[in-house]
Swiss-Prot record:
Gene3D superfamilies associated with the record: AP2/ERF domain (3.30.730.10)
Organism: Arabidopsis thaliana
GO terms under cellular component: nucleus
Gene name as annotated: ERF091
Main location: nucleus
Pfam families, A to Z: AP2
Record-annotated DNA-binding residue ranges: 109-168
PANTHER family: DNA-BINDING DOMAIN, OS05G0437100 PROTEIN
Protein name: Ethylene-responsive transcription factor ERF091
Amino acid sequence: MAFGNIQELDGEILKNVWANYIGTPQTDTRSIQVPEVSRTWEALPTLDDIPEGSREMLQSLDMSTEDQEWTEILDAIASFPNKTNHDPLTNPTIDSCSLSSRVSCKTRKYRGVRKRPWGKFAAEIRDSTRNGVRVWLGTFQTAEEAAMAYDKAAVRIRGTQKAHTNFQLETVIKAMEMDCNPNYYRMNNSNTSDPLRSSRKIGLRTGKEAVKAYDEVVDGMVENHCALSYCSTKEHSETRGLRGSEETWFDLRKRRRSNEDSMCQEVEMQKTVTGEETVCDVFGLFEFEDLGSDYLETLLSSF
């Protein structure tokens, strides 16, 4: 029997153990009392407490083999580490910690997702193009589906550069089945966010149906935004000299300003340049000929 490094124990302790074992009366096996585990070595009886008959029997025993076996047993018992009891009934702190960790793992919080009292998950987002108005996205069976709906709405409204999503951007774009183009997702026009109100019609559907319905609602919004961006790009290119057959708003305004300047020049040309013309159409005023200071004094003295 080998339990590691064997250390020799005191012979007096072994004698006390043997004396305690032999000194116990064995008249009736049912009346044998099991020694308590909590008893220490000091509490064991010594050789002085052993009766005379038992002491003579103890001296006749050969302790050569028993000494080594008891030493190995005692060393093995002493080398066993004290293991912590993991029973949840006796150690409730461990069970409570593990339970709280499991609960915290299950209840992960997502951006834009709220749990309803009846177990469903609601998703909503604030539209930054309309002064932070709350936009309802629907109610879903799981928190992941609601978080995905929020991510898709965030990408469509704020764009891929400014959107803060719950999942990775590649996962969201793959779910939307769109090309990863940052300019395509920018929704700066306030009118383009109005179709999001119709997402209330999604209602209490399954996750796939809700996401599909939301995609159908917002696809029209993206097409409208593309048309608006195309018009603005065309108008911008025309203002830079790439003019087409149609007149842009900037050109119309510039032409009106040039017309106003020409009208002012014509009014200036209509002013009288000779002394014979005393009437001017400018602002409906009369202009008199300069007759000199003498004529003015004569005219005033006559009154």
